[in-house]
């Protein structure tokens, strides 16, 4: 099945997400020397990068040339001093939506936690305050509303793929 080209990102059901980022925190824990909780000001004060990519979904659509801006996950891993036994990061969002990535993939320069989409602040329907983005990823790996990164030595597939496939299969 070919992909339909869309001009903008579609939106789906939005769970009870954070709209007030003043008290919101992103936590990093697990196999790290220095667990951290960062607010949006902390995150946006870190060096930022832009990642431009086509966004393709299993549902059969593509949005060409999307530009994300955010902080590299590798930058955050450096801040917390990852323990040598850590092999995977699990990104956590509301409603038990999780996605695991290898530390190797997290260290890629195009794996970021985005807070802007196409030069505008990320809106809630697109994953604000933070969305996991990695060039070439499957659409379900682009986890919206990320509030935690947990480092572990065990592979964690996460729930993202199954939730996405269930949504596609539902009429």
Model-derived features: positions:
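Short acidic (Asp/Glu) patches
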Residues: 39-41, 74-75, 114-116
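A glycine-rich, hydrophobic loop/mini-helix early in the fold
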Residues: 15-68
């Amino acid at each position: 099945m070919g992909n339909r080209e869309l001009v903008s990102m579609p939106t789906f059901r939005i769970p009870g997400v954070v709209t007030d980022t003043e008290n919101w925190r992103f936590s990093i824990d697990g196999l790290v020397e220095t667990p951290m909780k960062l607010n949006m000001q902390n995150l946006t004060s870190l060096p930022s990068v832009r990642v431009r990519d086509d966004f393709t979904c299993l549902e059969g659509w593509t949005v060409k040339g999307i530009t994300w801006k955010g902080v590299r996950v590798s930058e955050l891993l450096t801040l917390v001093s990852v323990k040598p036994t850590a092999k995977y990061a699990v990104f956590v969002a509301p409603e038990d939506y999780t996605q695991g990535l290898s530390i190797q993939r997290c260290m890629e320069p195009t794996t970021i936690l985005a807070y802007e989409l196409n030069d505008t602040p990320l809106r809630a329907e697109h994953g604000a305050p933070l969305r996991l983005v990695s060039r070439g990823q499957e659409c379900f790996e682009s986890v919206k509303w990320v509030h935690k990164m947990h480092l572990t030595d065990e592979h964690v597939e996460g729930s993202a793929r199954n939730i996405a496939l269930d949504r596609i299969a539902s009429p």
